[in-house]
Each structure stands twice: as structure tokens, then as C-alpha cells.
């Protein structure tokens, strides 16, 4: 019975060892630097062969036989770190976007970046009245010829200035002068002046009764003893039956006449 238990325990141990998953690099076991062209690339993981890192796109490959650790990102760029047994480590970056090599302290460093298209040595600026061209031979300015004619126009005259001098042309004014007001018009011309007054309508602003009258901003009222008139300037004029006048209002003391 005891031997059966030992056998069962051994079988379970073998199964557990076989079922233990392969460790993957999670960033806690060493540097994980990719960088930009010219910066050090150093990758280290636990697994041998190809593996992936959770949360990081691309693929890793650890090749201890070659002493290389390779990372290829999602864009196809490859970062290689070489241990170089017996010497300093080196790294290489290559891909569609850039390339760089660092062969160690004793080696030269080269960086290759896609070359930018060569710019034209010609620089051209254009304005309405001139053009400027700058190149290897210096700069060239070309000014367009301005018109010698200057023209100014007003409602009753025009002024033209050119090579021949100044020319002013005044249009003839009408001999008729016209003034119009709500209740009248006045026309003045060669034949004299004519004034025309219009009859006020029954809907005029004036209101009048037996003992009062009001129009716009003034009004008056009266009886047998006194009459009171409110003037447009805000003053009040009072006249009694004996002809005495009192003017008051607008913050001034009453004035007796």
C-alpha cells in the first residue's frame, strides 16, 4: 500500500514538471531597452528561441549559440544585441525606417537615415509689383513697371496725374437747390425761389380743447384766473390774471416778472 502511494506521488511529480509552462520575459529580469537610432539596444530574456512579451508588440528571439538577442517590432525594424564573448557588446538597428551600427568602443559608428531630396538652389518670391530670385549666382530683383497714371475720382470732380501733368475735370453742378421739411419745400434756382407749404392733417400731433393745448413736448392750460405753459426746455411759465409771470423749473429758483 505504501509502495503504491509512493508510485502515485512520483507520477504526479512528473506530470507537474511536464505541465510547467515555459517562462516568458516580463520586464523584471533585466534591461529592456530599444531606443532610437544611435542609442544602445540591450535585450535580455530567459527563454531560448522565439517568444513574445505581454504588452509589447513584435517578436523576440534569444540565440545563445550565436550570442545574439533579437527584437523585431511591428513595423519590421530589427534590434540586435551581440554579447561578443571576450569583448564589449555591440548592437545593430536596421529596418525600413532607419539603420544604425555600433561595433563597440573600438569600432566606428555609422547611422543611415533616408536621404532627403535635394532642395533646389533657387529661391523665388513674387509680389504684385516685383519678383526676387535667389540662387548660387546671387539674387536678382525684377520690378514691374508701374503705370504713370494716377487717377482720383470724387462725386463732382476727377483728378488725373501723369507724365503730362495734372488734369482736373469738374462736373457741372445743378443750378437747382432744394430743401425739404415735413411741412414745406423750398426750391432755389436761376428763376428765383419757390416755397411750398403743405396743409397739416387732422392727425397732427397738436391736441387742443376748450382750456388746454398740447403739442409734442409742450402743453398749456388756463382758466379765468391763471394760465400755465410747460415749455420744451423743461421750464414752466405761469401767468396770473394781473399779468404777473413766474418762470420755474430745471433746478433753478422761481423768477417773478
Curated annotation (Swiss-Prot):
Alphabetically, which GO biological process terms does the record hold?
antifungal innate immune response; defense response; humoral immune response; killing of cells of another organism; response to bacterium
The positions making up the signal sequence are 1-19
For the modification Pyrrolidone carboxylic acid, which residues carry it?
22, 122, 149, 176
Q: Where is this region: Disordered?
A: 95-122
Question: Which positions carry the propeptide annotation?
Answer: 20-21, 118-121, 145-148, 172-175, 199-204
Keywords (A to Z) from UniProt: Antimicrobial, Cleavage on pair of basic residues, Fungicide, Glycoprotein, Immunity, Innate immunity, Pyrrolidone carboxylic acid, Secreted, Signal
Q: Anything further noted?
A: In some wild flies and common laboratory strains, the BaraA locus has undergone a duplication event to produce two identical paralogs, BaraA1 and BaraA2. However BaraA copy number varies within these strains indicating that the duplication event is recent and not fixed. The name 'Baramicin' derives from the Japanese idiom Bara-Bara, meaning to break apart, and refers to the multiple peptides produced from the precursor protein.
Q: What is this protein called?
A: Baramicin A2
